[in-house]
């Protein structure tokens, strides 16, 4: 037993040497009040289910303004031909209106056109499996409580993926908690109020439960972070099949590289 405790303490000491170099821009899929410092950039690659990859680049234009682009590819890993989500990249834009103080949260407004999963194109029906946030506003508040603890709540409206007729304003919330200087645990809930139709053209059955996601982030070095995330823990979506319905709970790996220019 003593050997096990000693081994755990040794691992903890080994993994507390590096910490995240900037406030998190996102939890798993929803934004926070964090922006990139001026003159920095991140290159991020998301490895998704079904062999999909989602690379993205974000730039710190000023300390309060971050701009990014992303481009999704399905079935990139595996055999056969891969499929592009779209022929052009999606856009992310964040502007911090108010800095966080001891008494007030930070306030960020933004735009994110990147949805989750595959982009589905049918006659009169064009959207991602999970809609993009669109325009949003998010409030973030952090507390130094045995390591940083951050709470985030926001509202969003998708102005682009509305062919299903569901144009409701949506809500999301989440938190991130430092375990030590290297590891952070994250969880989020997207109410999906604008994405709760029971059946979209027989492609996806939605149960109206929203999307519950969680993840673990490791700051491996000052420039590199790795994440393991679990999506749709609430099993909101099912994918009809000839014999069975498959739920959409899935795992993904995210690789984030941070640098100055």
Write out the residue ranges for each language-model feature:
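Sec-dependent N-terminal signal peptides
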Residues: 3-13
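Short, surface-exposed alpha-helical recognition segments that flank or form part
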Residues: 163
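Transmembrane beta-barrel domains of Gram-negative outer membranes and organellar outer membranes
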Residues: 17-149, 155-160, 176-261
